[in-house]
């Protein structure tokens, strides 16, 4: 029988007596950040990892690679959606977007480095070991807040690598680089160069899903609405949704659950 919306949402992020996937912590020395780094791999239950699609999933400012599987319950949501027959199994890779770049004896936050780390280190390493992904059609990227900025920049610079895109409570414009209060590197204001990729007539053909969402009481809602105009001006085909709630996990959990049901079809 069909579940009511409220009951279904309750079940999606509750631990139940069903098969559960695994979480593995992978450590490596990054040549880009000059630091030891970690990413977390979720593998769904009862299926081999080889050949699975994979979603690279990023957290927000001030959080870490564990956030999506602790507060976010992303692994539990996927376990439940798989058991309910709502999605086909796919893997997750969650990396630390608060990249601490080691410069001499000091460390400083440089979130921009994540793009290179993903493309040059994390994706090759994870996909070689677990044999998932391996091609654009089996690879997606999504992120919330700061992670949405990292997602947009990465998919715009590398549309050949990803077929599914999720921008949660999200921004298509960079809002950290060049910000005097948040950019520890002290760069000049960023000129949104990555958005030029959206002027490509083939931009919409690169992605199966381009999902953008936010809460109706989010402190960044006005910025999101401003970016509606950019999306429309550039003719980007998107799925857009506004949820009840603020800039918090009460929005991001159902947002992730909905996005999971759109991708890798």
Each PLM stretch: what is its role?
Residues 243-249:
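Histidine-bearing beta->alpha loop at or near hydrolase active sites
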């Amino acid at each position: 029988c069909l579940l009511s919306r409220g009951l279904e949402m309750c079940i999606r992020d509750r631990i139940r007596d069903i098969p559960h996937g695994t979480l593995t912590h992978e450590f490596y020395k990054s040549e880009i950040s000059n630091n030891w780094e970690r990413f977390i791999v979720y593998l769904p239950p009862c299926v081999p990892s080889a050949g699975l699609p994979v979603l690279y999933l990023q957290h927000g400012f001030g959080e870490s690679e564990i956030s999506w599987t602790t507060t976010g319950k992303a692994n539990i949501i996927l376990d439940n959606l798989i058991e309910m027959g709502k999605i086909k199994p796919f893997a997750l890779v969650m990396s630390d977007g608060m990249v601490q770049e080691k410069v001499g004896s000091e460390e400083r936050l440089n979130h921009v480095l994540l793009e290179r780390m993903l493309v040059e280190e994390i994706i090759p390493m994870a996909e070689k070991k677990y044999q998932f992904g391996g091609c654009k059609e089996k690879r997606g990227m999504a992120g919330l807040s700061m992670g949405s900025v990292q997602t947009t920049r990465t998919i715009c610079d590398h549309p050949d690598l990803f077929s599914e895109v999720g921008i949660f409570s999200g921004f298509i414009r960079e809002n950290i680089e060049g910000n005097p209060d948040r950019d520890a590197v002290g760069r000049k204001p960023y000129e949104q160069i990555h958005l030029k990729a959206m002027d490509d007539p083939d931009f919409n053909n690169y992605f199966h899903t381009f999902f953008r969402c936010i809460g109706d009481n989010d402190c960044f809602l006005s910025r999101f609405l401003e970016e509606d105009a950019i999306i429309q001006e550039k003719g980007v085909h998107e799925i857009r949704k506004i949820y009840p709630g603020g800039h918090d996990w009460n929005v991001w959990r159902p947002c992730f659950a909905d996005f999971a049901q759109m991708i890798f079809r």
